[in-house]
């Protein structure tokens, strides 16, 4: 990897789990000057061969991410980043403050409009132990799942709280919101928006990604107790998550 004279500009992709951050990272990394290095706080992320890094202080860990990141290619890196999801901040609560204080760091907050889809996807992936789906994989879709009322409510609240926390912690010039649904529908212009926000040179990406969406069926076919949940959350702040296209 070739380093430019100036240190790369740092960024972080923040999100709840199962919001398309792997896909976004795959597309962003098509740019010859941008490198996103996976989940910094994930012990098992293969982008980071040294698990001992998690023993570092918060500041040392961010220095590792921004200045001493692992080489992946011969890219001339001008923008370097990583991903962090909401549960990882729970496991390392002091890290959020260090992130907000890091000079020049920009944040891409990825939001899935329907948080129930995010939870359903997480439970499916956990049960099947299949966290990614490749375009070459023709396996059957994952089985439907049961979602307890309390689990849904806690997850919905956690998502609302996390999104508000991130938005309130960063100046508007340092944060950009990306919707999962738009990323799937229009990946090329969506990534162009991200690159422009980071200040990376414009580039027409080819969307040669190898990942694909694991589940495309509607919620009433993938959540066994969907209708019971719909009744339970009717007329409340989360009723919108249970709307179907044919309603």
From Swiss-Prot:
PANTHER family: PROTEIN, PUTATIVE, EXPRESSED-RELATED. One of its GO terms (molecular function) is transferase activity. Pfam families: Sulfotransfer_3 (PF13469). Gene3D superfamilies: P-loop containing nucleotide triphosphate hydrolases. Keywords: Nodulation, Plasmid, Transferase. This is Nodulation protein H. The lineage of its organism: Bacteria, Pseudomonadati, Pseudomonadota, Alphaproteobacteria, Hyphomicrobiales. Residues 1-16 are annotated as: Hydrophobic. Signal peptide: none annotated. Its EC number is 2.8.2.-. InterPro entries: Nod_factor_sulfotransferase, P-loop_NTPase. Required for the formation of sulfated nod factor. Proposed to transfer activated sulfate (PAPS) to a N-acetylglucosamine of the nod factor.
């Amino acid at each position: 990897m070739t380093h430019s004279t100036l240190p790369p500009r740092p960024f972080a992709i923040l999100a709840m789990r199962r919001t398309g951050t792997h896909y976004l990272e795959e597309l962003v990394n098509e740019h010859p000057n941008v490198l996103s290095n996976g989940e910094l706080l994930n012990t098992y992320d293969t982008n980071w061969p040294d698990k001992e890094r998690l023993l570092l202080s918060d500041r040392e860990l961010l220095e590792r991410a921004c200045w001493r990141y692992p080489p992946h290619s011969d890219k001339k890196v001008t923008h370097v980043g990583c991903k962090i999801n909401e549960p990882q901040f729970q496991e390392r609560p002091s890290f959020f403050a260090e992130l907000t204080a890091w000079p020049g760091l920009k944040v891409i907050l990825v939001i899935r409009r329907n948080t129930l889809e995010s939870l359903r996807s997480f439970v499916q992936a956990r049960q099947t132990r299949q966290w990614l789906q490749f375009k070459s994989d023709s396996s059957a879709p994952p089985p439907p799942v049961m979602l307890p009322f309390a689990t849904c409510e806690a997850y919905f609240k956690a998502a609302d709280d996390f999104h508000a926390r991130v938005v309130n912690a960063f100046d508007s010039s340092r944060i950009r919101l990306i919707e999962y649904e738009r990323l799937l529908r229009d990946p090329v212009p969506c990534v162009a928006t991200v690159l422009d926000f980071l200040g990376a040179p414009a580039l027409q990406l080819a969307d040669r990604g190898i990942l694909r969406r694991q589940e495309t069926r509607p919620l009433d076919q993938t959540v066994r107790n969907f209708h019971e949940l719909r009744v339970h959350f009717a007329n409340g702040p989360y009723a919108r998550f249970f709307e179907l296209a044919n309603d």
